[in-house]
Amino acid sequence: VYKRQPEEIEKIVKAQRIAERAFSRLLRDIKPGQTEKHVAALLEYYMAEYGSDGKSFDTIAASGVNSASPHAVPTDKKLENGDFLTLDFGATYDGYHSDMTRTIAIGKVTDDMKKMYDAVLFANLDAMKAIRADISGKVADSVARSTLDAWGFGKYFGHGLGHGVGLEIHEAPSASPSSQYTLKEGMILTVEPGAYISGKYGVRTEDMVVVTNDGCRNLTNTTKDLIIID
């Protein structure tokens, strides 16, 4: 159940590639002084231009203090030097959705910001190493959580690790502390650990994987190195 046929995975990958092309184009256009609303609208426009049938969900563009809210709605806040900017977005192709998140930096980052970024990155990588057929969604989530704990950010991770993606943007299975699912070959799952310090900033790094018998295949091709917009 919730296993994807190869042709379904192909459509999800097509949606994902559209989103990634739009993101790489957006990176050339982002500059301080633009509003979150402007950035979100630009990303949605580029996805449409590259063949998306419509956005997968309302694009999140959350900068500075707003990045500390996992479900932030774009505002008129302007991007400033020293901000983190979290972009969570997806395209659709023939009814199938994609989902990815990258947190980037506007101008220079502090050592504390870099540490949070690295903690979330390693939580993402460690969870992806653990994901394979027949482990539970609960275990996958706990791997990311223990990595964040080790870095001192565990208490700032206030949501589940991930969810299925398909004809809906949120589907089974789930990976969270309360997940009842066992992962099976062919399931698609997001891997999206985050850390959010209220009143300061937050980071989330999200990839989409397909579960295999001996691991998982990442459907996301975009770098996870910290991108800094100068």
For every predicted segment, state its role.
Residues 3-230:
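Active-site neighborhoods and metal-handling regions in enzymes and metal-associated proteins
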